[in-house]
Amino acid sequence: MPPMTRNTRNNPNGRFPGAFAPEDEDDLPKSKSQRKRDMTALQDIGAELESLPKDRLARVPMPEALADAIHAARKITSHEGKRRQMQFVGKVMRGLDDDEIATIRAALEGFKGTSKAETARMHLIERWRELLLADDDALTKFLGEHPSVDVQSVRNIIRNARKEKELAKPPKYFRELFQAIKTALEAKDADAAPDNAPEPEA
């Protein structure tokens, strides 16, 4: 029988402390490259927050310390000052827990989805405008899909938009047509909303 050493006395199985089972991966220290990737990801999130419109930023759930750091960064105009403040934003973000970071990520992803929908709507309005200016038959189709439209008003806007284009005038009616189409689409959406559905008869 081999002589008993201090280690074998403390560990009858002959293993060093902590050697009874493999370490959980979550308990292993992160590599330098992984820490760098995590830090870069947090800096990117901080930059997204700093660039958000004011109303959207207000809707992102975040700790007060981070909100204060972001608001301070938005007020700084000098490049170097902004850079230092954004470094501080990154430092604050490294102190957040996983749930807080996940909540912020979810809010930002939600905004991206909204932006895609807004972009699609913008393209639809521009496409309708292009069709209405190019073809009188397009107005008949548009009116069929948007019955709430003031027909005479839209006809006048289209006529004036065509005329100002021919005369190379500023696009006043061109912009008005965009707004008229936008209003018509919004009215159609409102009519289709569940709140506006007719109540069933008793």
Curated annotation (Swiss-Prot):
<dbReference type="InterPro" id="IPR006839">
    <property type="entry name" value="DarP"/>
</dbReference>
<dbReference type="GO" id="GO:0019843">
    <property type="term" value="F:rRNA binding"/>
</dbReference>
<keyword id="KW-0690">Ribosome biogenesis</keyword>
<keyword id="KW-0699">rRNA-binding</keyword>
<dbReference type="Pfam" id="PF04751">
    <property type="entry name" value="DarP"/>
</dbReference>
<dbReference type="GO" id="GO:1902626">
    <property type="term" value="P:assembly of large subunit precursor of preribosome"/>
</dbReference>
<keyword id="KW-0963">Cytoplasm</keyword>
<comment type="function">
    <text>Member of a network of 50S ribosomal subunit biogenesis factors which assembles along the 30S-50S interface, preventing incorrect 23S rRNA structures from forming. Promotes peptidyl transferase center (PTC) maturation.</text>
</comment>
<keyword id="KW-0694">RNA-binding</keyword>
<protein>
    <recommendedName>
        <fullName>Dual-action ribosomal maturation protein DarP</fullName>
    </recommendedName>
</protein>
<feature type="compositionally biased region" description="Low complexity">
    <location>
        <begin position="1"/>
        <end position="13"/>
    </location>
</feature>
<dbReference type="InterPro" id="IPR023153">
    <property type="entry name" value="DarP_sf"/>
</dbReference>
<dbReference type="GO" id="GO:0043022">
    <property type="term" value="F:ribosome binding"/>
</dbReference>
<feature type="region of interest" description="Disordered">
    <location>
        <begin position="1"/>
        <end position="39"/>
    </location>
</feature>
<dbReference type="GO" id="GO:0005829">
    <property type="term" value="C:cytosol"/>
</dbReference>
<comment type="similarity">
    <text>Belongs to the DarP family.</text>
</comment>
